[in-house]
Amino acid sequence: MSPIEQIYDKIPDFAKDVRINLTSLMADETLSPRRKYGVLVASAVATRNSALIAAVESAASGVMTSVAIAAAKAAASVVVMNNVYYRFVHLASNPEYKTMPPRLRMDVIGNPGVDKSDFELWSLAVSSINGCGICIDAHERTLRAAGVNSETIQTAVRFAAITQSVAIALEAAGPASPQAGD
């Protein structure tokens, strides 16, 4: 049984829609395998669900290099920092914050070790999970400028949403909840 199938089996019956969406996600071929699993790794890391992270990373190792997996994790870790900062700048009433330099190190964005549009797509997925509108707009603009189409962008965000819903369903089930189909 694959790591993703093991996660599927842990999703409780109250989250049947989540199971169906996970099945659809795994069958979807809109994204290349590297893009797909990069979105899944970055999104799983953004959920902070250790079981989901381990399963997705294990599955990703069959289609991604260790460098690409590390880049997806780097996307999640640096983007969450930017999400918190820029969401604050956007929501704060004081306009002075918009004029201040962020002073946040983020060199990995300039040299992620993988195709920049892949890294940008993974970053968009994380920004979508974290709800940073400024970041979402910036990633979407960069992707469009790189020639990435709307369907690819929407698919990455849909995969991020499904990944987040899987994490929530697993957490809501708790450790002693019955497995799917029990």
Swiss-Prot record:
EC number: 1.11.1.28
Keywords: Antioxidant, Disulfide bond, Oxidoreductase, Peroxidase, Redox-active center
Catalytic activity: N(6)-[(R)-dihydrolipoyl]-L-lysyl-[lipoyl-carrier protein] + a hydroperoxide = N(6)-[(R)-lipoyl]-L-lysyl-[lipoyl-carrier protein] + an alcohol + H2O
SS bond list: 132-135
Active site positions, chain numbering: 132 (proton donor), 135 (cysteine sulfenic acid (-soh) intermediate)
GO annotation terms (biological process): cell redox homeostasis; response to oxidative stress
Broad class of enzyme this protein falls into: oxidoreductase
Keyword Disulfide bond: yes
Keyword Disulfide bond attributed: yes
Molecular-function GO terms, alphabetical: alkyl hydroperoxide reductase activity; disulfide oxidoreductase activity; hydroperoxide reductase activity; peroxiredoxin activity
Family, as annotated: Belongs to the AhpD family.
Function: Antioxidant protein with alkyl hydroperoxidase activity. Required for the reduction of the AhpC active site cysteine residues and for the regeneration of the AhpC enzyme activity.
Name of protein: Alkyl hydroperoxide reductase AhpD
Classification lineage: Bacteria, Pseudomonadati, Pseudomonadota, Alphaproteobacteria, Hyphomicrobiales
